[in-house]
Every structure is written in C-alpha cells, then in structure tokens.
C-alpha cells in the first residue's frame, strides 16, 4: 500500500509530467494502490469531474497488468476523458453508458443509437428526462451508487 507521502509524491510527479507535455497513468497489480492513486487525484485541477475518475478507475482496473504507461501529450486524444468536462455518464439496469461531447467516435455512435426506438423507450421508462426533454440529475445518488459498484468489482478479484 502507498503511504500518504508517496501519494503526494506521485501527484507531484504526475503534475510535472503533465506540464512537460506528457501524460502518465501508473498502475500496479494491487487494486487498493490504484484506488489510492485515483482518490489522491480527486483534488487535482486537471481531473475535475466525477465521471472522468470513474472512467480512470475502470481503465486502471482493465489494464492492471501494466506497470506504467507514459505517452507524449500529442497522443492524449486517446484519453480525452481526463480533460473533457462534457462527459455524460448514465447507469441503467446495471449497464453504464459513457459519452463525451465533441469526439467523433462518440458522435457517430450516438447518431446510430438516436435512430433506435429502444433507446427512447429505455430513457422514458427510467425517467432520465422530464416532459420538456431536460435531464433530471441526481449526481450525489449516482456517484454514491457507482462508488459502491466499483468497490465491489475491485474487491472481488
């Protein structure tokens, strides 16, 4: 496990790498280390929103066999979720949907899904939107349930 001072050193190192036009994700096989790393990033300026932290936890969980991954910032488009404030994260019937505004891949997928009547029925049943089409947001409840689900997935390795 990381002692608290090590988490601070990692955050300083990540900030320095980010300022030098590099992007870094560090991962160990121990999932508690990954959780501590992500939770230490929660206060950083360049990771501001909760959905990006969920996605980072998912990324670290899926690629936990990597020891480190450092790439030039010009390849940062793969990791647009870390700096894009327009991420939409929805959970419905134990499934997660992620969409980032402005990325061509997500735009194409959302246009394909827009033609599907099943999506409209699912959204209407789940009451994600009111009668005017505006989203009904419960960020605290969603955040809490997602943290519980992520912790359950991580602890059942």
From Swiss-Prot:
GO terms for cellular component: chloroplast. It comes from the Eukaryota. It is an enzyme of class 3 (hydrolase). Signal peptide: none annotated. Its EC number is 3.4.22.-. Inhibited by HgCl(2), iodoacetamide (IAA) and, to a far lesser extent, by SDS, hydrogen peroxide H(1)O(2), KCl, NaCl, ZnCl(2), AgSO(4), CdCl(2), FeCl(3), PMSF, Pepstatin A and EDTA. Repressed moderately by many organic solvents such as diethyl ether, ethy lacetate, acetophenone, butanol, trichloroethylene, tetrahydrofuran, methanol, chloroform and dichloromethane, and, to a lesser extent, by propanol, benzyl alcohol and chlorobenzene. One of its GO terms (molecular function) is cysteine-type peptidase activity. Accumulates in latex (at protein level). Optimum temperature is 45-50 degrees Celsius. Stable up to 60 degrees Celsius. GO terms for biological process: mRNA processing; proteolysis. Optimum pH is 6.3. High activity and stability in the pH range from 5.0 to 8.0. InterPro entries: Maturase_MatK, Maturase_MatK_N. Has a potential role in leather processing industry due to its dehairing activity for animal hide without hydrolyzing fibrous protein. May also have application in detergent industries due to its stability and its ability to hydrolyze blood stain. Keywords: Glycoprotein, Hydrolase, mRNA processing, Protease, Thiol protease. Glycosylated. On the 2D-gel the determined pI of this protein is: 3.4, its MW is: 43.67 kDa. Belongs to the intron maturase 2 family. MatK subfamily. Monomer. Cysteine protease inducing milk clotting by cleaving casein. Exhibits biomedical activities such as wound healing, haemostatic and antibacterial activity, as well as agricultural application in biocontrol process against the infectious management of the root knot nematode Meloidogyne incognita. This is Cysteine protease Nivulian-2. It comes from Euphorbia nivulia (Leafy milk hedge).
């Amino acid at each position: 496990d990381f002692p608290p001072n090590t988490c601070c050193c990692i955050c300083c190192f990540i900030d320095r790498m980010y300022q030098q036009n590099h992007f870094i994700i560090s991962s160990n096989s121990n999932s508690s280390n990954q959780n501590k790393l992500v939770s230490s990033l929660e206060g950083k300026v360049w990771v501001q929103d909760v959905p990006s932290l969920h996605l980072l936890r998912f990324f670290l969980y899926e690629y936990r066999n990597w020891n480190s991954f450092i790439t030039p910032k010009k390849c940062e488009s793969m990791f647009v979720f870390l700096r894009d404030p327009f991420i939409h994260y929805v959970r419905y019937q134990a499934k997660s949907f992620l969409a980032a505004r402005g990325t061509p891949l997500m735009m194409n997928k959302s246009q394909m899904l827009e033609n599907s009547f099943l999506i409209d029925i699912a959204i209407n049943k789940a009451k994600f939107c009111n009668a005017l089409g505006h989203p009904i947001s419960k960020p605290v409840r969603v955040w809490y349930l997602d943290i519980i689900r992520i912790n359950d997935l991580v602890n059942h390795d």
